[in-house]
């Protein structure tokens, strides 16, 4: 929240808003840390794929580590640089979930639970990226990344509106960015 909220938006949260932030972070961390740990790429997005004569190659894997089972699918379908239609995201997540279950990847047996995990993981990534992109602009003089922030701020807003545990985050984002009409799937 230091780079995006304080620096980019020039906002200092009051005590209530800080409490909302702390509640939101706790809800996200509780979800993410409860997930099974598997080997994850950590930067699994279209920009890191290359088609070769032998098949698909994955680039930029030096940061791979053990992390939440939803990390890579959240990275791919909640890309900071590409917007996917929500029905496409649901379809791809269902396909991933079905195949992962068949090969024994430790994911929830209930799809709605897995989708929630994917959304919370995507939310954590986008909150982090908002701060990183603001930092790249203000500290490193790289303003081009800020052009992509509306996309993942919208991801954050959309996900926060879907889950009661994230309603404090919804209020923070609406206060920070202005409010919008609610549209989308609910679980």
Role assignments for model-derived ranges:
Residues 8-13, 36, 102-108, 140-143, ...:
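Surface-exposed helix-capping loop/turn segments at secondary-structure junctions
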Residues 44:
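Hydrophobic HxD+1 residue recognition
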Residues 107-116:
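Histidine/acidic-rich helix-loop-helix segments that form or flank divalent-metal centers
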Residues 131-187:
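ATP/Mg2+ or Mg2+-diphosphate-binding catalytic cores
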């Amino acid at each position: 929240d230091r780079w995006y909220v304080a620096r980019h938006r020039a906002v200092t949260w009051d005590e209530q808003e800080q409490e909302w932030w702390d509640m939101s972070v706790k809800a996200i961390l509780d979800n993410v840390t409860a997930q099974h740990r598997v080997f994850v790429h950590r930067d699994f997005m279209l920009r890191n794929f290359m088609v070769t004569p032998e098949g698909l190659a994955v680039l930029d894997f030096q940061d791979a580590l053990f992390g939440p089972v939803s990390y890579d699918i959240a990275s791919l379908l909640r890309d900071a640089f590409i917007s996917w239609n929500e029905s496409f995201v649901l379809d791809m997540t269902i396909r991933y979930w079905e195949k992962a279950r068949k090969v024994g990847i430790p994911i929830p047996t209930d799809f709605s639970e897995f989708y929630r995990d994917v959304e919370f993981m995507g939310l954590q990534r986008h909150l982090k990226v908002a701060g990183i992109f603001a930092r790249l602009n203000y500290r490193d003089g790289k303003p081009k990344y800020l052009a992509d922030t509306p996309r993942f701020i919208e991801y954050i807003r959309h996900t926060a509106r879907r889950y009661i545990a994230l309603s404090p985050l919804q209020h923070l984002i609406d206060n920070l960015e202005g409010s919008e009409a609610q549209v989308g799937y609910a679980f």
